[in-house]
Amino acid sequence: MALIEDRLFTRIKNRVGRAIADYNLIEEGDRIAVAVSGGKDSYTLLHILETLRKRAPVRYEIMAINIDSGYPGFRADIIEEHLREHGFVAHMEKTDHYGIIKEKRRPDSSYCSICARLKRGVLYGLAQRYNCNKLALGHHMDDFIETLLLNQFFVGSLKAMAPSMLADNGLTTVIRPLVYVPEEDIIPFSRNNRFPVLCCCCPVCGSADQQRKRMKELLKTLEKENPFVKKSLLKALANVQPRYLLDRRVKY
């Protein structure tokens, strides 16, 4: 089934295209591994990048990568069927992350942080195995803003995410082309196109990451007084003025 090319599609496509241009996310000859978790964000990213690939002035290739972490009930076959129906080159990686996490996790710690680290390492390895020089992740505008607030409130750091950065392995460039796309656009886009959205089936899915949920609620409250608060916070990430901060490592 082809994507529904309505105004919402056009808006998302244009914002992804602008992010690619602003941060030089995609270049001639790139091979891009797109991490597809089964969530609305990664499906949206994959389909928009494929749409742009067919129309872009530069040539690049994409492939989908899914990691099955071994959580009971996770239906990787549903993702695989969707990818096959839409003609995507894909690799489905089966792991026992669930078993590792159960063994290594401290009783008072979250599944999420350990799971994310394990997945990240596998994603980097798969990108190298398939000669992909870039790894595309589905973090959207709200993720950038919430991460900024989380680091300020709970870590004491002015840090968010980067739209493009060299991974820890020094070989793979991680890109986040949805940086300009708000979650409120992705939700109806995914629903309208009937993407088979799946839960990761983690035992604490839906209850973990309470701090991020608190940031979402805070932003909703702020938006009632200032509808442009998210745009302003995102703009702030591109308008850093170190001279007016307290980092003693910065020399003037």
Swiss-Prot record:
Pfam families in alphabetical order: ATP_bind_3
Cofactor mode of binding and number, as noted: Binds 1 [4Fe-4S] cluster per subunit. The cluster is chelated by three Cys residues, the fourth Fe has a free coordination site that may bind a sulfur atom transferred from the persulfide of IscS.
InterPro entries membership: Rossmann-like_a/b/a_fold, TilS/TtcA_N, tRNA_Cyd_32_2_STrfase, tRNA_thiolation_TtcA_Ctu1
GO cellular component, one term: cytoplasm
Motif PP-loop motif positions after renumbering to this chain: 37-42
Principal cellular location given in the protein's record: cytoplasm
Family indicated by similarity: Belongs to the TtcA family.
Name by which UniProt lists this protein: tRNA-cytidine(32) 2-sulfurtransferase
Recorded name of the encoding gene: ttcA
